[in-house]
Amino acid sequence: MPYLLEMKNITKTFGSVKAIDNVSLRLNAGEIVSLCGENGSGKSTLMKVLCGIYPHGSYEGEIIFAGEEIQASHIRDTERKGIAIIHQELALVKELTVLENIFLGNEITHNGIMDYDLMTLRCQKLLAQVSLSISPDTRVGDLGLGQQQLVEIAKALNKQVRLLILDEPTASLTEQETSVLLDIIRDLQQHGIACIYISHKLNEVKAISDTICVIRDGQHIGTRDAAGMSEDDIITMMVGRELTALYPNEPHTTGDEILRIEHLTAWHPVNRHIKRVNDVSFSLKRGEILGIAGLVGAGRTETIQCLFGVWPGQWEGKIYIDGKQVDIRNCQQAIAQGIAMVPEDRKRDGIVPVMAVGKNITLAALKKFTGSISQLDDAAEQKCILESIQQLKVKTSSPDLAIGRLSGGNQQKAILARCLLLNPRILILDEPTRGIDIGAKYEIYKLINQLVQQGIAVIVISSELPEVLGLSDRVLVMHEGKLKANLINHNLTQEQVMEAALRSEHHVEKQSV
């Protein structure tokens, strides 16, 4: 039986750099292939070649789809063939309805007039196919990220898709939304639709894949049956070496209390009747890693936004640093108290995409390079930039390159470098490894461990429970704005954390760390 897709000996160069070097990929109808590799390995470049974003003639090699050679000059050419890609950054127009998004550019018309009745009927069938119980007239901006992801799939199905490419589809989804999405992909597989699945979440890769293809440094390392591979096997192929322990287990001691929060309550920015954080109190010691776990809507991010002075709504409570009550109402006041934060959404809140990597790193610490006459010392700034890039192992061709062109992992390292320039005593990390590859995660985990050994106190918020449990000395469990448990991490399990989140009473372990 012929393959649905064959990519033969694909090579793509940018100047003298080979982003893809003689890579081949093939899959059958109804097959799910996971494409794995570190950020910058060439996965996205390969998919852009396949989809026509990089047109025929700009690369070497051959693409055969459904028995015919594809020589696409535009993404529309491959869409007509039945190839659709859904990027991590969804391409929906939030101001339009679900129906309008699904049929955007593919409207059903009769004599130049759109047939809304027929489109509504078709839209309802597509939504049912992806198990989405919403009205076609719902505004996309009113949907959650998980629902928007399913609308994207419905949009692809409307184009008679035969091959669906999903790039980091669950990076911003809850566990429940992820489970729904994986079930939808399996259902599409039963209807003969093939899928190329790109994800750094190896548990998902193992759960969904028939075959796993690994790319490293632009080269094809190997393709194997998923059933015969462990997560460690995938990691070794991706990074070219064994990671003996993903989470550093180097001992570190905690000091005295550096931070205490008492009776923190925060209200919704618009609806004052809704409490997003409800009477939360906790403390933090020097050299301690404090994890905050909870389901979406638990109030984790809202809590630390109050601490960093960036919560947009009203809040009340007391913050003590070194035993003294402090008033923090903006990020400048937080920084002055020795607090730095890596935000949850790095693209929205963490970087200026068009600004140079170096300028992003020094953005919050320009006073360090400003003399008495308010003139910037360019030489001192450049020296600091180069030292930060080297220390954090930020992979960039130049400090002057726009940071938006870096991989997610290297953007995150640059944000961390900016935080460290502030010489923080308390470092807040909100989803520190979201959407970055396993190698970059490992480097960030090692850095966190080094920081706490220097006495810096770290707060880690993550939707990935293994990450919280692998890093933290102590875990706060939140649910619906309330602190449900304060647990010492003595071999804590995911089940214990979830049980604590959902139990009715508050639970605190009183042992010292």
UniProtKB/Swiss-Prot annotation:
Chemical reaction(s) catalysed: D-xylose(out) + ATP + H2O = D-xylose(in) + ADP + phosphate + H(+)
Binding-site positions, ATP: 37-44
Subcellular location as annotated: Cell inner membrane
Enzyme class (EC, first level): translocase
InterPro entries xrefs: AAA+_ATPase, ABC_carbohydrate_import_ATPase, ABC_transporter-like_ATP-bd, ABC_transporter-like_CS, ABC_transptr_XylG, P-loop_NTPase
Gene3D superfamilies the record matches: P-loop containing nucleotide triphosphate hydrolases
Family: Belongs to the ABC transporter superfamily. Xylose importer (TC 3.A.1.2.4) family.
Protein name per Swiss-Prot or TrEMBL: Xylose import ATP-binding protein XylG
Organism this protein belongs to: Escherichia coli O6:H1 (strain CFT073 / ATCC 700928 / UPEC)
Lineage, highest ranks first: Bacteria, Pseudomonadati, Pseudomonadota, Gammaproteobacteria, Enterobacterales
